[in-house]
């Protein structure tokens, strides 16, 4: 028999690791955008993206750019590759976060 609490914490750990991978990939994408597409880099607030004074609407602009797959028309294949990877990581992290919330709710009901 397995412990549901241990399973929950293992799932939380996997979710946190995937979030760290996602943010690391986002940093790599921003550094590539700085060199290959400075206009896009400025429009998504590249310098202030991970700061406390970052502009949320510009950060959401990058998320929409990736989720709507507008990067497919980009001239740099490295940007296309990184955006596709980032999109898949976002879907995975969102799914895992939803699963953690569902597990937490079910544990609260169960116990």
From Swiss-Prot:
Entry GO CC: plasma membrane
UniProtKB keywords: Cell inner membrane, Cell membrane, Membrane, Transmembrane, Transmembrane helix
InterPro entries with a match to the protein in the record: Universal_stress_protein_B (IPR019598)
Protein topology in the membrane: Multi-pass membrane protein
Pfam family membership, one: UspB
Segments traversing the membrane: 1-21, 90-110
Coiled coil stretches, renumbered: none
Entry's localization field: Cell inner membrane
NCBIfam families to which the protein is assigned, alphabetical: PRK04960.1
Name of this chain's protein: Universal stress protein B
